[in-house]
Amino acid sequence: MRSPRMRVCAKSVLLSHWLFLAYVLMVCCKLMSASSQHLRGHAGHHQIKQGTCEVVAVHRCCNKNRIEERSQTVKCSCFPGQVAGTTRAQPSCVEASIVIQKWWCHMNPCLEGEDCKVLPDYSGWSCSSGNKVKTTKVTR
């Protein structure tokens, strides 16, 4: 038969084991949380090679006239004197003067074989080939 003192000692050992296990679990959770935040931070904020752009979000929908509307968010790292633009239907760095003066077709935004025309209000451009027309409006 165990003495009351042994039962107290066994309970304190058991309690200390549980406390130690809880401490180890807490440390592991903190380490895992910190490492996942570190990885997420790098995934969302990685560096882009200078002079290039990448698409970070794409949105696509149809309006009530059954015309498809697309928009995208682009992240660029351009050289001095350059800004985000479009070349051959892809995001790119272009000379800032093209955008400032709204000479959109000077950045060659259309695909090979398409004709570029600046919109009458200078808010963007259209690329056409045959009866197909793609219109791009610039927003900031």
Swiss-Prot record:
It is found in: Secreted. The keyword Protein biosynthesis does not apply. Keywords: Secreted, Signal. It holds the Pfam family TAFA. PANTHER family: CHEMOKINE-LIKE PROTEIN TAFA FAMILY MEMBER, CHEMOKINE-LIKE PROTEIN TAFA-4. The keyword Secreted applies. GO terms for cellular component: extracellular space; glutamatergic synapse; synaptic vesicle membrane. InterPro entries: Chemokine-like_TAFA, TAFA_chemokine-like. Transmembrane segments: none annotated. GO terms for molecular function: receptor ligand activity. It comes from the Eukaryota. Modulates injury-induced and chemical pain hypersensitivity. Ligand of FPR1, can chemoattract macrophages, promote phagocytosis and increase ROS release. Residues 1-35 form the signal peptide. One of its GO terms (biological process) is regulation of membrane potential. It comes from Homo sapiens (Human). This is Chemokine-like protein TAFA-4. The gene is TAFA4. Expressed in brain. Expressed in LPS-stimulated monocytes and macrophages, especially in polarized M1. The lineage of its organism: Eukaryota, Metazoa, Chordata, Craniata, Vertebrata.
